[in-house]
Amino acid sequence: MIEIKNVSYSYENAVTDGALKNVSLCIPQGQMVLLCGESGSGKTTFGRLVNGLIPCYYEGKLTGSIMVNGNDTTQLQLHELAGTVGSVFQNPKSQFYTLLTDTEIIFACENTGMEKREILRRFTETVQDFRLERLLGKNVSQLSGGEKQKIACASVSMLRPPILVLDEPTSNLDISAIRELREIVAKWKATGKTVLIAEHRLWWLRGLADRVVVFQEGSIVEDVPADEFWRRTPDELHAEGLRGSCRFAPQVKEHRADAQYIISPFRSSDGEFTLNIPELKIPKGAVVAVLGNNGAGKSTFARCLCGLVRKCKAQIIDGEKRYAGRKLSSLAYMVFQDVNHQLFSESVSEDVTLGLRLSEDEKRSTAEEMLWRMELWGCREAHPMALSCGQKQRLAIAGALAAQKDIIFYDEPTSGLDYRNMERVAENIRRLSEMGKTQFVITHDPELVEKCCDRFLFFENGKITNSGSWTAEAVNQLRGYFESSSE
C-alpha cells in the first residue's frame, strides 16, 4: 500500500513556488492508477516520492508523510527501496548501465547479490514473458525506442517489485510499440502489482487503469474511478488540458507550384541500416508530417538534410542555389528528440539566442519575444535543466524560432507535452508556415498532424512508401495507422 499524507515539496532552485502542495493519496495494493495533468503539474514529482528519488536524489524542501508498504521512504536509501518499487523513465537510456541487452536485464539482480541459479531462472522467465528472444545479445544503443522501453521494463521486472512507477513511458513510442507496452502493463496488473503511470497519452490505458488522479499546479484536483473518467468527451478532456482521442481529419492547404525545394535523391548507410530517398519536391511554406514506425529512417532522413551525417551526400536545391554538406546547416535547423542534448546555457533566456549573431539588445528582444510566445517568460532566469520535460521541449522550439532558418525539422516536438502545449506548438508551426518557413515534423502524434500538417511522408524500412497532400485515400490509410489512438 502507498500512503501519502499532507505532502508538500519544492525543488531546490525551483521555477515555481512548489512542485506539490499538501497532497494526500492512498493507493491499495494491486491498483493501477493513471496520473495525468498538464506539464509541470506535479505528476512526475509524485512518482519520485513513491520510488524514493525524492529525497534521496532530488534536493528540496519536503514536509508530510510518505509510506510505501509500511516503510517511511524518507528514512530509506534507494537500494533499500529497489526491491519494493521499480521505475521506468520517459527516456529508458537514462537507466541503462551496460552495453548489451542480456547484461542489462540481469544487472539489478547481480547488484543485489542474488544467486546465479535464481538469476538465470528469472532471466529465462522474463525473456519468455516479454518475448525478448530476438533482442538478446544486441547493443542497447542500437535498439529502437520501443525496444529500449521493453528492455527497461524487463530489467525492472527481474527484481519482482510489487510496485511499479512509469513516467510518460509512451512519449517517444510509435503505435506498435505502445501496443506492446500495453501488453506488458496488462501482465503486471494481472499478477496483482500496483502500477502508477504518469502520462499525457491517455487512450492506451482505457480498460487498464482502475483510477484516474488529475494534478493541477501541484495539487490533486480530481480522483475518480476510471470508468467515470472515460465517459468524458474529447472536448471535455481538452478543456482540462488533457489528451483525447483523435478523429484524424487533417486540413488540406494549397501551395504555390512555382515555389518549392527540390531534395535530390540520396542514400545513407551505417552498415546495418540503409536509407534510400528519391527526388522530392516540397512546396515552400509546407508543413510535412514525417510518419512511420520507430527505426523506419525518419530521424536519419532529417539529420542528413541538416548536414549532421558526415558521409551522406544529401542536397537541397532552391532555384539556382544548391545546399550540400556543411552548407545545409545554413538552411536547415533541427530540434532534437532528446532536448537535453541542445540546452547548454546557464539560463533559459540565454539558451534561446545561443549561437546567434545578434547584438546584445537584439538578443534580449528576440529572447523576450520567443519566451512570451512559448509561455516561458516566467522561467527566463531559471537553469534549463530545472524545467519540466514539456518546458524543455518548448524552450528548444523557441530556439528554432529564434534561429530564423528557412527549413526547420522537429523530431517528436510534442513528446512529453500536454494538450494545451501541443496546441501551442501547432500554432507556432502554422505561424511559421504563414511566414514561408518550410517545416518537417517527425511525429507519432495524430493530434499534432491534424492541427498543423498539410503534407506527409510515410517511411517503412528506410524507404518512403507514400507521400503527398491529404487526399481522401491518404487520410483513410493514415487513419488506419493511427486507429489505436481512437480506441
Regions found by a protein language model. Give the residues of each.
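ABC ATPase NBD Q-loop/coupling interface
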Residues: S65-E80, Q315-L328
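Conserved ABC ATPase "signature" region
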Residues: R117-L135, E362-C379
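Conserved ABC ATPase signature
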Residues: N139-L143, E147, H383-L387, Q391
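Catalytic Walker B motif of ABC-type/P-loop ATPase nucleotide-binding domains
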Residues: L164-D167, I408-D411
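ABC-family nucleotide-binding domains
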Residues: D174, D418
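H-loop/switch region of ABC-family ATPase nucleotide-binding domains
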Residues: E199-H200, T443-H444
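Conserved beta-strand-loop-alpha-helix hinge in the C-terminal portion
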Residues: S219-G241, K463-S486
